[in-house]
């Protein structure tokens, strides 16, 4: 179990840009810009919900229970940097990012909750105990299209967002799906789940 707080939220969570959408749709005017931006926001949110994860780079504080294992797993990935780790109120520095994409921090003596285990008296995990005694401050996520830094968001995810926005835009007048949303004075009915299931199956977080 863990308890996560966002310390520095992302200013931008759009998984693609208006420019990319207009290029895909071969649109050269600005008539539908506001509508398209709304669709980008909505489809980016739907992708986050579908994948059970936040893709934008943010800074988190996470309280995690240690069970004596050598790996501590953080919720948000990829882990870009770890700013601090505390055991209760004591700083810990003898760790390393073991697998950034899996959110794994490695510590050779283990991440133990019990003080006697912390000092190496035992290497056995105490799985019955769920005290959140480690506090980790870390940065995780991707640089998104439209951010000032070079994009690190995988193109597969951006392409999925582009296709969702494109299909929603083109189905404004004739859509057989059942979910309906209203953007401004225009009603849009579009369910991207089948498309997302096909394109982003490998990106769905299962825990």
Segment roles from a protein language model:
Residues 1-207:
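Divalent metal-cofactor coordination and adjacent catalytic microenvironments
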């Amino acid at each position: 179990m863990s308890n996560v707080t966002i310390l520095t939220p992302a200013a931008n969570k759009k998984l693609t840009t208006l420019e990319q959408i207009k290029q895909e749709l071969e649109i050269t005017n600005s008539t539908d810009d506001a509508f398209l931006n709304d669709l980008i926001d909505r489809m980016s949110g739907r992708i986050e919900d579908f994948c059970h994860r936040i893709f934008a780079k943010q800074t988190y504080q996470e309280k995690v229970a240690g069970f004596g294992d050598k790996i501590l797993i953080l919720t948000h990935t990829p882990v870009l940097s770890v700013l601090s780790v505390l055991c209760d109120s004591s700083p810990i520095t003898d760790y390393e990012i073991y697998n950034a994409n899996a959110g794994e921090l490695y510590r050779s003596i283990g991440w133990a909750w019990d003080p006697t285990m912390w000092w190496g008296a035992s290497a056995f995990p105490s799985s019955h105990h769920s005290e959140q005694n480690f506090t980790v401050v870390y940065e995780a996520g991707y640089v998104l299209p439209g951010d000032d830094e070079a994009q690190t968001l995988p193109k597969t995810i951006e392409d999925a967002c582009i296709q969702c926005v494109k299909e929603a835009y083109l189905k404004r007048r004739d859509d057989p799906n059942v979910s309906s949303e209203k953007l401004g004075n225009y009603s849009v009915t579009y369910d991207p789940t089948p498309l997302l299931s096909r394109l982003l199956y490998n990106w769905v977080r299962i825990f």
